[in-house]
Amino acid sequence: MTVENTALTLKKRFRGYFPVVVDVETAGFNAQTDALLEICAVTLSMDENGDLHPASTIHFHVEPFEGANLEKEALEFNGIRDPFSPLRGAVTEQEALKEIYKLIRREQKAADCSRAIMVAHNAAFDLSFVNAANERCKLKRVPFHPFATFDTATLSGLAYGQTVLAKACKTAGMEFDNREAHSALYDTEKTAELFCGIVNKWKALGGWPLIEDENEK
């Protein structure tokens, strides 16, 4: 494999990290006390030309953990009227996370990456809820880096001058249906599309692969 082809791999592009796009819907802003109600993850793959694309999607509605706080305003915002309704088909936090991590580990290994890194819109929020759920479930083998992320709010602010997901997507030339927004599944798919678009645009503009000094090869 040539130096250039080596650079056009997921492993090389993100310094050994395997990016996974995540979105959560919750019953408030406090990751320690408020319920995690929905989670979706989209893995990414890189084609032979070095362009990034969404790969696999995994999505769960989640049962509120025992004693979880449910803020009325948050439920109205995300449209989850009754978190305890059997019609949601919800699973426990542990079931959801274990299945998500199983998929991530499999695809991370196939990409020869050393660790997963979360990609999310306002990533600190999503990571805080995932980390809190990991602690509640006493999960030891967590694929995500505990604090490093790729935040598409920041990246889209740089690339498109917009930090709101809907506005960033529209500025990027993507379709965005506000009626579908605040569903973890829809928001994750759109965030994945946005992140891939930013990475691919940077490559198309000549930002990647880096031009290495001959003495460093």
From Swiss-Prot:
UniProt-annotated site: Important for substrate binding and specificity, residues: F29, F77, F125, F147
E.C. no: 3.1.13.-
Example of a GO biological process term: tRNA processing
InterPro entries assigned to the protein according to its UniProt record, in alphabetical order: Exonuclease_RNaseT/DNA_pol3, RNase_T, RNaseH-like_sf, RNaseH_sf
TM annotation in the entry: none
GO CC annotation, single: cytosol
UniProt-annotated binding residues for Mg(2+) 1: D23
Keywords: Exonuclease, Hydrolase, Magnesium, Metal-binding, Nuclease, tRNA processing
Enzyme class, broadest EC rank: hydrolase
Residue ranges of domain Exonuclease in the record: 20-195
Annotated positions binding Mg(2+) 2: D23, E25, H182, D187
GO molecular function: 3'-5' exonuclease activity; magnesium ion binding; nucleic acid binding; RNA exonuclease activity, producing 5'-phosphomonoesters
Cofactor requirements of the protein: Mg(2+)
Active site: H182 (proton donor/acceptor)
Function field: Trims short 3' overhangs of a variety of RNA species, leaving a one or two nucleotide 3' overhang. Responsible for the end-turnover of tRNA: specifically removes the terminal AMP residue from uncharged tRNA (tRNA-C-C-A). Also appears to be involved in tRNA biosynthesis.
Family from the record: Belongs to the RNase T family.
Protein name as catalogued: Ribonuclease T
Annotated organism of origin: Vibrio vulnificus (strain YJ016)
